[in-house]
Amino acid sequence: MILVDWQITDRIERGYIGIDPYNPELIQPNSIDIRLGNHFVWYTPGDEIIDPYIRDTVTGGTEEMTAESIVLHPGQFVLAETMEAIRLPDNIVASIEGKSSIARLGIELHQTGGWIDAGFAGSITLEMCNVNQRPVRMHAGMPIGQLVFYTTERALCPYNAKKDAKYLNQRQATLSRYYENKKRA
C-alpha cells in the first residue's frame, strides 16, 4: 500500500519514518518532496575502463565539490546527494521519482537506483544526467524529486541489519561500492 499525505505526516511526527531536515510543506498527496544537497561527484573524461570489481578504477578519475549550484552539461553524469537524510523502519520501503518539472528540463534524477530498502538510513545518492541539448543549472535546496513510501510485511533482515550494507548512514554523494561484492561465476 502506498502511504498518502496524512499517513506520511503521522509516521514522521511519531518518529516511525525519519526525515532530517523535515519540512511539512514538502508533503504531497502521495509522497514527500526531497531537495538537492550541495555535494557532487563525477567522473572526469578519459579512456580508462571502469571495472566494477576493481576499486581503483571505480574511485579514481573523479572530481567532487561542495557548492550551492552546479551546471549539468549535455550528456554529463553526476552523483549528487539529497539534502534530507532518511530513516526507514523494517516494514516500509521507498522509491525515488523525479519531479516532472525537472524532467521537462532534461534532467534524469536516477538511472536505475531508485529503490530504497526497509531499514535504510542516510542521505540518498542521486544518479543525475542531463539529456537536454543545453546546460542546466541545478541549485542546492531546490525540490528535485519525490519519495513514495510503501508498507510491506516486516523484513526478516532489513538493510540496517545486513553485514554488507554498503551505503548505510551515507551523508554525501557516494561512488559505487560494487567492488565490495563477492564476484560470482
UniProtKB/Swiss-Prot annotation:
The keyword Transcription regulation does not apply. The active site is at E127 (proton donor/acceptor). PANTHER family: DCTP DEAMINASE. The keyword Membrane does not apply. GO terms for molecular function: dCTP deaminase (dUMP-forming) activity; dCTP deaminase activity; nucleotide binding. One of its GO terms (biological process) is dUMP biosynthetic process. This is dCTP deaminase, dUMP-forming. DCTP binds at K99, S100, S101, I102, A103, R104, D117, T125, L126, E127, Q146, Y159, K166, Q170. Belongs to the dCTP deaminase family. It catalyses: dCTP + 2 H2O = dUMP + NH4(+) + diphosphate. Homotrimer. Pathway: Pyrimidine metabolism; dUMP biosynthesis; dUMP from dCTP: step 1/1.
